[in-house]
Amino acid sequence: MPDLYDDGDMNNMPSKLFEIERRIKNIFINYSFQEIRTPILEDANLFKRSVGSSSDIVNKEIYSFNDRNDKIIAMRPEGTASVIRSIVEKKLDHLSHKLWYMGPMWRYERPQKGRYRQFNQAGIEILGIQEGLPEFEMISVVCSLIQEFEIKNCLIKINHLGTKQDKEAFCKALVNFLEPYKKELNEKDFERLHKNPLRVLDSKSAETQNLLKKAPSIKDFIDKSAINLLNSIKKQFSDICDIEIDYSLVRGLDYYSGFVFEAISSELGAQDSFLGGGRYDHLCSQLGGKEMPAIGMALGLERFSNLVTLTNNKIKMVSFIILASNIEPKAYKIAHNLRSFNKAVVLDISLAEGSLKSKMRRANKNNADYAIILGEEELENETAVIKPLKDELKEQQTVSIEDLYSFYKAL
C-alpha cells in the first residue's frame, strides 16, 4: 500500500483516509462501542482454526514465517479471530461486549484499485448477546455509515444460514444436486464442493452460477424465526437504505453461522462488495472458550474510500504568526491560551523562522480562515492583528489580547 501522509487535501487518498477513519470512529463511539487493540502478529494456527483451513485466506493469502523457536507466526489477515482469542485468554467469554477496532491487515492477493496486500480495516463485534437486537444494531451501523458518507448506488444484502444442523442439511442437499454436474465445474468450484460446499454459492464462474439457478435454496432449510428476522430487518430499515433478502448470500470465512450480510455498490464495478459481516456463535468455543453468541462486521478502508467524495475539512483553521524571535516565549503563551479556549479550532503556529510574506504564504497554502499576527509593537501594547484570509470584504483589525481571546472562543 502507499505511504500515508495527511496534507489536508481531501482529493488525495491519505488525507481522505484519515478523515474517513475519524468519522467512522465517531459513529462507533456514538453506538457505545469500546476500542480493542490486538497484536499484528499471531500464532498462524489461530486463523486455521477460525477462518478455516480450506479458505482462500489460509491457503493462498496469509503472510506467515517461522520465528526463532520454529513457531509459525502470521500477520493478521482479519480482525475477528484476534478479538475472540483475546476475550478467551482473558476469560471474559461469560460477559457481553461491544467492541470496535481499526488497523492494518495483510493478505497476499493481486494488488488493484482499493485492494492492497497491506490494507486498513475497521470493524465492530457484539459478543455475548443472542440473535435479535444485535442484528438490528449491525444493520443500523451499516446504514449510518452509508448515510454519513452519502454512498451512492448502494444495496445491503441479507441472508440467514440457519443453525449448524440446518447448514449441514443444506450442504448435503447442495452436494447431491451438483454431483451429477461436477465435470462442468471449474477446478476451484470442484474443490469447494468437497471441502466447503457452501462456498460454491459464492462462485465467480458464470457456468457454476447458471447451474445454481435450479439448486436447492437455504430458505427451505431454515426455520420460520430466521425468515421472520430477515423480513423484519428489511421492513424496519428499507426506508433508510436499500435492503434485499438474498438466499444465495454466503460469507468467505468458515466461522459464519446464522444471520449474514454485505453491502455492495455498483460504483465499484464487478467486485462490488465493500462491507460484510454476520453471526459466528461457535467461534469462541472453537478457540477454547465457552459457547458465546457473537456477531460482527468489517470494511476495508482503502476500498471504502473509492466510494467516498469529501469536501475539504470544514474545521476552522487559524495561522498564528510571530514576527520576532525575541517575543516568541510570550507569544507562544498566548497561543497556548487560545488552544485551551477553543479545541474545535486548529491553530497552526509557524515554528520556523521566516518573513511575514513567507508565513502568510504558508497560511494560505494551509487553507487557513484567519491569520493572527504578533510583532514587538503588538506585544508591547498587549494587542494582536486578526487578518481574515477567506473574506476579501473584511479588513484586518488590531484588537486587545482579551478581545482576541473572545474572538477565538466564538469561532
Indicate residue ranges for each PLM-predicted region.
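A positional/architectural concept
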Residues: 35, 72-75
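Polyanion/phosphate-binding surface patch
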Residues: 40-73
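A generic structural motif
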Residues: 69-71, 125-132, 162-164
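Auxiliary tRNA-acceptor-end handling modules of aminoacyl-tRNA synthetases
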Residues: 1-17
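Acidic, His- and aromatic-enriched active-site or binding-groove loops in soluble protein domains
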Residues: 56-68, 172-201, 265-267
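Short, hinge-like loop/turn segments at secondary-structure boundaries
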Residues: 53-55, 172-174, 366, 388-391
